[in-house]
Design a protein with these regions (language model features):
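Conserved HGGG/HGGXW glycine-rich cap/lid loop of the alpha/beta-hydrolase fold
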Residues: 2-48, 58
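Conserved alpha/beta-hydrolase "nucleophile elbow" surrounding the catalytic nucleophile
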Residues: 12-14, 67, 71-73, 191
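Conserved acidic catalytic loop of the alpha/beta-hydrolase fold
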Residues: 50-67
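Conserved hydrolase catalytic core segment
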Residues: 66-104
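Conserved alpha/beta-hydrolase catalytic His-Asp/Glu region
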Residues: 102-109, 121-181
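Short beta-strand/loop motif that positions the catalytic acidic residue
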Residues: 182, 188-190, 194
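Catalytic histidine neighborhood in serine/cysteine hydrolases
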Residues: 199, 203-222
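Catalytic histidine-centered segment of alpha/beta-hydrolase-like enzymes
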Residues: 220-233
Length: 243
C-alpha cells in the first residue's frame, strides 16, 4: 500500500453489494487507496454494532490504521457505530443517503413487513418491490433497463443476509451525539428525491457536526453513486483534499 495515499473506505447499503461503487472507480482510484468491503453476505450479525466490529476486523487484517469512512444508507448506520467505538481509526467521515436518527415506530413496523416478505417470497421479490423507491424519477424514466439489471443482479443475494441487515437497522439507536462529536468535517450526500431518507431530515443533520459539507442532488433518489457518478466522484475527491 502506498503510504502517501489516503485510504478511503466505501461501505455499501442494504440490498446491494460493493459493486454499487463500480461507476466511481475510474475517478477516485487514481487519487486514493479505495477499499470496498462487501457485507452483503453476512448472516451472523444482528446489530449494527456487530457489523461495525466485523468492519474493524476487516480493516485491521488489511493493516489499515487510518481511513476516511463513507457509508451509504445502512452502511452509514454501521459507520456511525464504528465511529462511536473506533474513532481513533478515522480521519474523515461521510453519510451517503443515510441518517443518524433511529427508526420511528412506523419505520420499524415497515421493516417487520419487509422481513415477512423476504421469508415468504425470497430475495428477488423483495428487490423488485423496493427497486422503484431507490431511484429518482428522471433516472427511472431515462434508464428502465438499468433498473431491470439492478433487480437481476441483486435479486441473487441470500435472504438470510438481508433479514439480518433489516433486523440490525430496525434496532439501531439514535447516534446524533456521535455525529456531533466527530472532530473533522463531515460529508453529507443527499438526494432531494430520496424516498427512503427524506431530504428535510438529513439536511437537519448537517447542523450537528462542527463542520459539514453537504452535496445535494436535486434530481437523484437514494442511489447517487449510480444516478450521478461523476458529480459524486468529484465531491468525494474534493472532500478528501480538505481533510
Amino acid at each position: 500500500m502506498n503510504l502517501h495515499r489516503k485510504t478511503l473506505v466505501l461501505l455499501h447499503g442494504h440490498g446491494i453489494d460493493d459493486t454499487i461503487w463500480d461507476s466511481l472507480d475510474a475517478a477516485i482510484n487514481d487519487t486514493h487507496t479505495v477499499v470496498r468491503p462487501n457485507i452483503s453476505l453476512f448472516t451472523s450479525c444482528q446489530t449494527v454494532e456487530e457489523y461495525a466490529d466485523e468492519l474493524h476486523r476487516f480493516l485491521t487484517n488489511a493493516n489499515i490504521q487510518k481511513c476516511t469512512l463513507i457509508g451509504h444508507s445502512m452502511g452509514g448506520y454501521i459507520s456511525l457505530a464504528f465511529a462511536e467505538k473506533y474513532m481513533d481509526m478515522l480521519e474523515g467521515f461521510g453519510l451517503f443517503h443515510s441518517t443518524a436518527y433511529a427508526d420511528d415506530d412506523a419505520k420499524k413496523h415497515q421493516r417487520g413487513q419487509m422481513i415477512e416478505l423476504l421469508r415468504t417470497y425470497g430475495t428477488e421479490s423483495f428487490v423488485k418491490s423496493t427497486a422503484a423507491n431507490l431511484f429518482g424519477d428522471r433516472y427511472k424514466e431515462l434508464y428502465p433497463e438499468r433498473i431491470k439489471e439492478h433487480i437481476a443482479h441483486f435479486g441473487k443475494l441470500p435472504a438470510e443476509a438481508l433479514i439480518a441487515g433489516i433486523t440490525a437497522m430496525r434496532n439501531r439507536p439514535d447516534r446524533t451525539a456521535v455525529l456531533a462529536s466527530l472532530p473533522f468535517p463531515v460529508l453529507f450526500i443527499i438526494g432531494m428525491q430520496d424516498k427512503l431518507i427524506p431530504f428535510e431530515s438529513v439536511i437537519e443533520l448537517a447542523e450537528f457536526p462542527k463542520k459539514s459539507y453537504p452535496l445535494i442532488f436535486a434530481e437523484a433518489g437514494h442511489m447517487g453513486m449510480v444516478e450521478r457518478p461523476d458529480a459524486t466522484a468529484r465531491m468525494i475527491n474534493w472532500y478528501m483534499s480538505k481533510i
